[in-house]
Amino acid sequence: MAEKCAFWNEYDSIAGHICYCELAAFNRPVNPNFLSAIGCSPEKRVECMKSMEYAVGKGVIPEELAPPVTTTAAPVLSCDPPPEIAKTLVGVAQKKATTPAPALVMLALLAGAYISLGAVLFIIVTNDLSLYIGDGLSRLVGGLSFSLGLILVVLGGAELFTGNNLLAAGYLDKKVTGKQVLNNWFWVYLFNFVGALLVVFLFYFSGIWQANDGSVATRIINIAAAKTSLSWSEAFFRGILCNWLVCLAVWIAMAGKDAISKILGIMIPIAAFVAAGFEHSIANMFFVPMGILVKGSELAQSLVAPALLQGITWQTFFINNLIPVTLGNIIGGVVFVAAAYWTCYLRPVEGNKIATDGKGIL
């Protein structure tokens, strides 16, 4: 009607759209001359009558005259609640446990390389940063830089041993067998090491480690020396704390529905573990072998005390660092994340349903 009658009003909250022809319904006489003046034909009056009857409660407004109906869509959550993450985790565990061997080893190699690329960025960014902003802030910036590795793993798609410790949730939920979990861990761990060593050799032969007047090389040596000089118990407990945070980063990334949410969810826990000085087995597959290669260079021997170089060996790497850190990583991921959240959200409880209302436990 709006396009048919120049005198159509905008809207009436009670009657909807009303034209001047309807004045007759309210005992306001409208003579034929007035109707002709406004261009109201008999056909138009039929349409107006329908609207008029609606206005006085005697009819239903025609569909074409009805006011627009507005609907409010349900808000879309920017992330899944914890119970949904737990279900997603079990589904991911099932998928990972059945990944074909060729794809599994390639994705594992890529993950080792990605974590090592994050380690390269960490070394370059922090080689002399503490001189300008202090140790604490340098650790934080280094942690944010290192998070590149897990971002590439999660968004790019790869198989990381420490993240795959979460497969334990699938085992607890009886969707994955223990044999499948151990098989996945073995091959992923092995080829994470291969991927890390690949980046070690590429970075070494690139010569970039000689940059900044040897400051980068010194940083590499200091990191490797610190890691190989840890006691067994120190390395073990730092490994637990590290993978607790790493698996939380993976857990949060699973909740995110867009790339930005996933990236932010990864960066903060990873920055925390790096800044605190916790130990990550796959990252150490880059840091210490890189130190072993660099320590034999004339540059390193001219810059670093011989006593510091002597402690960086394959033996100290495996015994003092990699073995205890790996065991700690497994406990941190399996016990404190996979088992903890499975118990909270998925463990069957007779006559009760635990925390499945979409809210976390505070």
Positions of predicted regions on the chain:
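Alpha-helical transmembrane segments and their helix-helix packing motifs
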Residues: 62-362
